[in-house]
Amino acid sequence: MYNSNITDITTLLPHRYPFLLIDRIIAYQKNFNILTIKNISYSEFCFTGHFYKNPVFPGVLILEAIAQSACLLVYKSFGMSYKNNLFYLTNIIDVKFKKKVIPGDQMLINVFVDKHHHRLIRFVGHVSVSKYIVCKATISCLLTNDVVSR
């Protein structure tokens, strides 16, 4: 089991409030997978207009949480950070939203490396709330500098 704090995360990721969507890393296996948490609070910036009297965490932000988790996995696996290698989302496929995410929920984000070839890496992400999958997606990301294929 692995446990991190927000300082560990902000050392690796360039994202800051309101777009830092990872609160904690709870498990990590080098070059394989990462498990992260995002706590959903009513004070999230998106709830002022999404939707009035019926707040729903936007699906695009769930996908961004998957991408940020993937970024953390790569940065930790290769001893990098945003300071020496940026990570760009290039593709999103096979997205399925199964349930809505609302204030008070805790998203558990599980991301696995699917394929890795030099700078291009494909991931599969599953997001769950209370043991129910709320989103599945396959994403691809590109590093600005080459890394050795595993």
UniProtKB/Swiss-Prot annotation:
One of its GO terms (molecular function) is (3R)-hydroxyacyl-[acyl-carrier-protein] dehydratase activity. InterPro entries: FabA_FabZ, FabZ, HotDog_dom_sf. GO terms for biological process: fatty acid biosynthetic process; lipid A biosynthetic process. Its main location: cytoplasm. It is an enzyme of class 4 (lyase). Keywords: Cytoplasm, Lipid A biosynthesis, Lipid biosynthesis, Lipid metabolism, Lyase. Pfam families: FabA. The active site is at H50. It catalyses: a (3R)-hydroxyacyl-[ACP] = a (2E)-enoyl-[ACP] + H2O. Belongs to the thioester dehydratase family. FabZ subfamily. This is 3-hydroxyacyl-[acyl-carrier-protein] dehydratase FabZ. It comes from Buchnera aphidicola subsp. Baizongia pistaciae (strain Bp). The lineage of its organism: Bacteria, Pseudomonadati, Pseudomonadota, Gammaproteobacteria, Enterobacterales. The gene is fabZ.
